[in-house]
């Protein structure tokens, strides 16, 4: 039986077009028995499918797609406790868009971030437990991410950014 993946993709998107060539039409995937069906749609519709938003239309509440190509900006705060929450109220707020309900993964994600800042060894141990369980479940398969760079005129003074300091704070300090 082949692995069939239903892919919700945004229309007029160069990355989606590249993924068609690299994934959907990849002869190695075809040989392995993997079939990827792309459905191109507007970004708003893709989000309705991602969040299973039946308030927009009952069809969105029915799990249909198991692949979405959306970029992510990785933050320096590696806190996944809500990303893999099994709590119904968190899911209603838009967390756990993978709909992977695994108590062990949720607990590992929570344990990882609930240690005191000076407990580095405990954090490392918990991180390994989380990543091990994450790899067993493989709820996400990252294909690409955003990387941000700042380019500015050398006349600009006090433009100091970091992964911890947002754009709005940076603008306020610059002149």
Residue ranges and their predicted role:
Residues 29-90:
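Periplasmic binding protein-like
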Residues 10-15, 43-45, 72-77, 148-151:
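Solvent-exposed loop/turn segments at secondary-structure junctions
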Residues 24-34, 51, 55, 73, ...:
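Sec-exported extracytoplasmic/periplasmic mature domains
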Residues 34-41, 122, 140, 145:
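Surface-exposed patches in mature extracellular/periplasmic domains of secreted proteins
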Residues 10-18, 41, 96-103, 117-125:
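Soluble non-cytosolic domains of exported or imported proteins
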Residues 1-26, 129:
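Append "and occasionally in soluble cytosolic enzymes with long acidic Gly/Pro-rich linkers
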Residues 1, 49-59, 82-115, 145-175:
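Short, solvent-exposed loop/beta-turn-alpha elements that line the ligand-binding surface or hinge
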